[in-house]
Amino acid sequence: MKAFSCLLAVIATAASLFQHVDASHARDKLNNISRVERPVIHTPSRRVHAHSHFDLTFDLYPRRNRIKLQLEPNHDVLSHNARVTFLDTEGNVDRIERIERRDHSVFKGWAWTQAKSGVWERVGWARIIMHRDGEDPLFEGVFTVMHDHHQVIAKSKYVRKRHQQDPPLDNTPGEYMLLFRGSDIAQTQSTGNVERSIMSSPSCDADTLAYDSNSNFMFPPLPEENNTSIWNYFMTSIGKRQMTDTGGVVPGSRDLKETIGSTSGCPNTRKVALIGVVADCTYTNTFASEMDARADIISVVNAASVVYEHSFNISLTLGEINILPKNCPATASSATPFNQQCDDRAGGGSFTLADRLNTFSAWRGKKTDDFAFWTLMTDCTTENQVGLAWAAQLCVKGVQGNPDSRNSSSQAVAGANVVSKTDNTWQVFAHEAGHIFGAVHDCDSMLCQNPANPDNSRCCPATASTCDARGRFMMNPTSGSQITNFSPCSIGQICSRMARRTILTNCLTTNRGVDTISGQQCGNGIVEDGEDCDCGDEESCKGNTCCDPKTCKYTSGSQCDDANEECCKGCKFASSSTICRTSSGPCDPEEKCSGNSGDCPHDIHSKDGGTCGTDLQCASGQCTSRDLQCQMHLGNQVAGSRTVAFDSYGCEVACKDPDRPNVRYEGSLTFLDGTPCGGGGTCKNGQCSGSTFGNEVSDWVSRHKPIVIGVAVGAGCLLLLAIASCICGRSRRQRPRNRKMPPINMRPMAPAYNGWNGAPPNAQQSSPGGHPPYNNIPPPINAPPPAYPGHMPPTRYA
């Protein structure tokens, strides 16, 4: 019975949820760790500042490999208006400071290795933050060598986060740098994925089902009456981060395979995604100062941004940092309920990582900025989970739902995630951000063999014909080696979602006119005031004949820059007949160049609700319907092209087979924004918005006609019975009764007469008063009242 109850809980949960979360887990043990030896800053004074360009070399002990990092300032990691807000333990603003770019030596560049011949060969990218320069430099960051990421961390950080089975350190005093590779993490022989306890036999405990035990792979058909769950949104685990993650509207399996490697929909020119980060008390407490905490956040974003730049042409840029004091409050403030000491339900506590995400999401929902998303940095974990993220919430403002401390299943969904501090925090951050951009997990051996995922539609396959991606990419369900890029499938999925508008992109800005923290900096890839163009450093500008990388001015005769302006062809403005953005259908008209500018006009689409075909309407620039979206997303699991929407009311994708009209099929999906829903409203981020009470009543009546008819008939019958009862009662009260009247003792009157009948008898014997004499004879019992002359007609006697 217990197993049966558990199974029911799993099915009910999986079948009813439409928004969900992904959870990362900590890495497994390290097989090897190296010490960074002989670091040298190649400047005359061995000194650098925030705007320096320099080379940095060092050895990897004990391999003795010589590494060179060719570095330059990363100016676009901080926005011009970037600030840090210091909060007190109650969540009130203590002070606000501008983040000065000169205070943060943040660099980007390329990694090189030296061959035995002495020749340097470029082998990857590098992102570094310099803590100390001089003859004994100290830096942290990440670089890649042939797609294998190399993490450089300070000894103090390694000691604090060291796993029990990690290699021990010697007794060398002082602070120095350590390095480990992705390939140094313990791996299974079959797939190269990290071994974890979470990968053991799946557990099924209804009491802890809410988050990391959930799987949105389960889509069994359920009767409608059994398809109600207390959960409004779906949370799944990312590591084993967990089965999958697909929030919002996710393309079906055919779409995932068809878009592998496609960048159609992603920006052709650099875009900037502004983000906000909050450091809670547990995170701040791991650093010697608030300045160190700030530097670590900048380092994390600096490293993660490179993956998005290379894959999607989007830079992640810090707009605001909030830092809470290192001393955690005894009782969390209502202003910052997420700011609590570490607590774990599994260990008898009551505040999990999922609770932090819920309360943080509610906090983020009150912010009025235009940031792409917000991240909460913490030092807490739940068991071995180190990250959670809501799916497909890029650029989403506000919040759906509200966390209730009395109800563990209540959830608030917003553009937010939670990242725990680890020795590879940047990877967790990049992975969680990938879910906010709408990516599902890459397929691994477990997902490919899952019987509830027969067509591999809930994960990104390696190729159209191969399921298992073998743990090589950023959206792998578990941490693994050589993870430095998104898979071709993830790139295709995110780009296609941008093209189809199943994620918002309105918060992404162009690199033109974006102020950076350092003001005008030629070579940072952002076109600022006083610059015509900026193609980046000289390496990035190779082959660019339109822009001079040294002056950031157009070359002689150039009107625009092909690399940064969509309406620029051969350094000249494209003609007005040039299509700079193609149409994706009848609801998305093409845009053409103006002929006098290098910029493509804003992307516009037809108004939602407009007719675009038989039984089709425009929604988010697509010509579609509820039935068509059901066919696209769940058709291969239901009835193919015969699949139809279960009803016309909600915004979660619920479908049915016409042959089984009472069986409801659901997935972790929502209808496109602009799709009609109940009460005359339209779907917006998974919620029905704009409905009216009158229309909702009308819709409810139309959806429940049998009930309405039954109630009406029953009420009518009761009313008729009541009326009939009243009529019968009234009739009984008014019916005359045949009762004998008592004798009336009254003086008899002489019968009336009329002159036409002659004189009455004994007329000659009148009484002295002239009145006829009275007969002493009583009238009959039932005689009518006496008639009086002039009032009643005379009575005739026979």
From Swiss-Prot:
Gene: ADM-B
Function: Probable zinc protease.
Transmembrane segments: 707-727
Membrane side Extracellular: residue ranges: 24-706
Membrane topology term: Single-pass type I membrane protein
Protein name as catalogued: Disintegrin and metalloproteinase domain-containing protein B
UniProt keywords, alphabetically: Disulfide bond, Glycoprotein, Hydrolase, Membrane, Metal-binding, Metalloprotease, Protease, Signal, Transmembrane, Transmembrane helix, Zinc
InterPro entries with a match to the protein in the record: ADAMTS_CR_2, Disintegrin_dom, Disintegrin_dom_sf, MetalloPept_cat_dom_sf, Peptidase_M12B, ZnMc_ADAM_fungal
